[in-house]
Amino acid sequence: MRKKLVAGNWKMHGSLQQNAALLELIKAGVSSLPCEVAVCPPYPYLGQVQSILSGSALAWGAQSVSEHQSGAFTGEVAASMLLEFGCRYVLVGHSERRALYGETDTVVSAKFEAVQRAGLVPVLCVGETLAERESGMTSVVVARQLSAVLGRVGVAAMASAVVAYEPVWAIGTGVTASPAQAQEVHAAIRAKVAELDLGVANGLRILYGGSVKPQNAMELFGQDDIDGGLIGGAALVADDFLAICRAAN
């Protein structure tokens, strides 16, 4: 039985005051929930998050990472640095990183490897644009993104990783993939991994990300191959985020 995971991606939002209030509400609300819950704040707030959440049921992580371990890479953050702030998870390959900052499949797979090398859990984000979906390329695009990582690190590495399917056309748009649409892609991701190792595939948690709200979370999370959610905007509102977490149970 795969344990559900709900992870909040704060993106470039927050302040010390806002974060403290949000975290205290979430911390109080998830203490009795059987699913795993995590938050991914901007880098500068990791120390604050660690201070507030240490000893709680909540995990935390980062939104990106450098593929390098150290060196003259101005503005970059190494996975080993994230480990020192108590991070458990690191997002790699989020669609905004791919689209806005030119992260290729090669770069994403290198980041995935760097995260695992540091002892952290990568959350590999995959997904198609609207144009790719409308041209029937969803399965091809997602398979390519997944294969780039599998080709670099091997299928065994997926036993200590998470995958998040995020249809780009549904992120921040208010448009959500239907439960059936999401399930179809999640099942295809699991089948792709199963071609290499059935046991790893059966244990792999695959999250859905793309305009998840309290109103649609339960139906999405009720699908056979959807193991939780990667939550954007709703993760910034305690009541909404907690409602989504409850829907995962």
Swiss-Prot record:
Name recorded for this polypeptide: Triosephosphate isomerase
Swiss-Prot/TrEMBL GO biological process terms: gluconeogenesis; glyceraldehyde-3-phosphate biosynthetic process; glycerol catabolic process; glycolytic process
CDD domains in the record: TIM
Catalytically driven reaction(s): D-glyceraldehyde 3-phosphate = dihydroxyacetone phosphate
PROSITE patterns: TIM_1, TIM_2
GO molecular function: triose-phosphate isomerase activity
The keyword Transmembrane appears for this protein: no
InterPro entries hit by this protein: Aldolase_TIM, TIM_sf, TrioseP_Isoase_bac/euk, Triosephosphate_isomerase, Triosephosphate_isomerase_AS
Record text on subunit structure and interactions: Homodimer.
